[in-house]
Amino acid sequence: MRCPKCTSIEDKVIDSRISKEGSTIRRRRECLECGYRFSTTESLVRDGIVVIKRDGRREEFSRDKLLHAVRAACHKRPVDVEQITMLIEDVIDMLEAHYDSEIPSAAIGDAVMQRLRSMDQVAYVRFASVYKEFRDVSEFMQEISALGKKEK
């Protein structure tokens, strides 16, 4: 792993921890050149999963794209990186259990929304606004109203 400070590739692993769900490993590393300490996260690379978009196009599944979307929804919310990582892994595990090699994008969006709803309602509405392509404020109001009804 390349040191983010001096770019040396010589380092040693100081500590390794497996995540609660068991699908990622966090490693604490120390650069042997400059002594800088940094963390890395390792996860299983899932090959061959194709997402079927709404318009029928197909593209390779990108964990990073999903992570970026969830991070954007959770920006400046009381949701930590570990919660986001667990959400992503949970969604991916669920999708792999229900689908073989092709996953409809709607299934991904629905799975994320279901988990965000119970995690953080503001993040849920943010994600829903992009996923459902809200065009005006009335659509936000409808989603917020529906969210309030589901809570009761």
Swiss-Prot record:
Molecular-function GO terms, alphabetical: ATP binding; DNA binding; zinc ion binding
Highest taxon of source: Bacteria
Protein's UniProt keywords contain Repeat: no
GO biological process: negative regulation of DNA-templated transcription
Keywords in alphabetical order: ATP-binding, DNA-binding, Metal-binding, Nucleotide-binding, Repressor, Transcription, Transcription regulation, Zinc, Zinc-finger
Family membership noted in the UniProt record: Belongs to the NrdR family.
Described purpose of this protein according to its UniProt entry: Negatively regulates transcription of bacterial ribonucleotide reductase nrd genes and operons by binding to NrdR-boxes.
Protein name as it appears in the record: Transcriptional repressor NrdR
Originating species: Opitutus terrae (strain DSM 11246 / JCM 15787 / PB90-1)
